[in-house]
């Protein structure tokens, strides 16, 4: 069945050269010149990586603080007690607790975007693997969401730190902001994301790590981005 595209989408795709790899700043300028949607679209960088997602030693995962934030309101849940719990509340976490929150999550509570836990809390939080795991919400030391410094973690997430993880097809997609952002802000966020993904290259990866990069917005066509300036010699 053929996909029916909107008039706006068809007009946008005529402006994009599908054979060209654009410098990041040029790609963002072009994206911003395309017809906007009726809502503030999320702008995303998608990476096709030269790794085998079936191999555990080729997993690509990490975090990236966006210099200009993500434009998204992030709801944070923290599993902690005592001083760490108090610090999380003062830093702005929406939900803070321990056994009460574990029970609440087991009962189906899902009104949060990021979960953080202290190392001491993880022995119990691991019981939520089947609940939080499928949604990508299980706290993990590699993404800075298992930590004693709950205040720092909450502030970083609220400020726009994004997480990324390789999917089963060897792709990584990372939001870099909103369509309403200034071009310079999107460019700086995008550069930070590309650099973070490059640094996350597994030591076991062979050959070209970043095979291609695509910039897109929710309702607009993607365009290829040249990652060469961000690659180490």
Task: Kindly give the residue locations of the regions a language model identified.
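Flexible, glycine/charged-enriched surface loops at secondary-structure junctions
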Residues: 39-43, 200-212
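Generic N-terminal amphipathic, Lys/Arg-enriched alpha-helix
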Residues: 3-17
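Residue-level signature of catalytic and energy-coupling elements of molecular machines
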Residues: 27, 88, 133, 215
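Long, charge-patterned amphipathic alpha-helical coiled-coil/hairpin "stalk" segments used as oligomerization
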Residues: 93-200
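Flexible glycine-/small-residue-rich
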Residues: 47, 80, 118-119, 176-178, ...
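Short, charged, intrinsically disordered terminal tails
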Residues: 4, 225-233
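Translation machinery proteins
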Residues: 22-86, 107, 113
